[in-house]
Amino acid sequence: MLLGMLGLGIAWLVGLPFRIAAHWWTLRHDQSELGYLAWIVSDWAILAAEFCSICLALLIVMGLARWLGEHWWLPGAAVFVAIAALFNFVAPYLDYTTDPLRDKSLLADARRYESELGLSRIPIRVERVSDDTDQANAYAYGIGPTRRVVFWDTMLQEPFSAGEQRVVLAHELAHHSQSHLPEGIAWFALFAVPGAWILMRTTRRRGGMGAPEAIPLALLVVVVFQLVTTPLANTISRRMEAEADWKALQVTRDPASLESLMVGFSKTSLGDPDPPGWAQLMLGTHPSLVDRVAMARAWAERRGN
């Protein structure tokens, strides 16, 4: 448990200055009203879940290493994947901040898009963030029976039109119809196998993963491995997002709303609509706004609109 706390604490502290800088930027441009302390503790439920995941992973892997010696890494990789899948499954149950969507028109659109995308009914919920920020967002999460789509309430307000809201809804439902979250777990498995092997090799001289003194080195290796694999992970994420955009265009048949949505995002997110290549490689989990507008126009041209 102490090792899990150490691992989470180190990872959290390393990233904290960057998150503070990002929050300072949103405060400077009046995109957030949360003070620094309130902002830091706002995601305590997710942080607690991550802490439990790290503790569980370390306990199991250390037990496997003491039992199997250097052969722990393959079943250890399976443990990492199982915990990731479990976290994705239970995450919606940790959500205490959302309410059911009450917009009957948008709910009717959801039922129609679900039918076109071959989905069973997906709960659509709303997270109230307008007291804290003006930024807009929506996301899909959960797997199997816990699948959800969540709108920030700012996404359901001006300046976003009904057409833009429908595009966002279709995009998030497309993540579920294309099984992007299970696919993400599958990609994680492909990263976890070599990652576990590298952990085994690099911790050998410290007594292996079964020895407590090897844990700080193991945590460093994990951080470096994540940094090295970030460009590939971002490439995979951008492909999924582009696929969801394309599916959204197919069911809404409204490229103009997708284009205007991207213009709206450029104003509310404070992001660069056309970031340099290195930034997109290392930080871009979504296609650039310019690329997404180009997709909308290409779809319209193909349809002869």
Pin down the residues of each PLM region.
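Polar-ligand-bearing catalytic/cofactor-coordination segments
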Residues: 1-209, 231-305
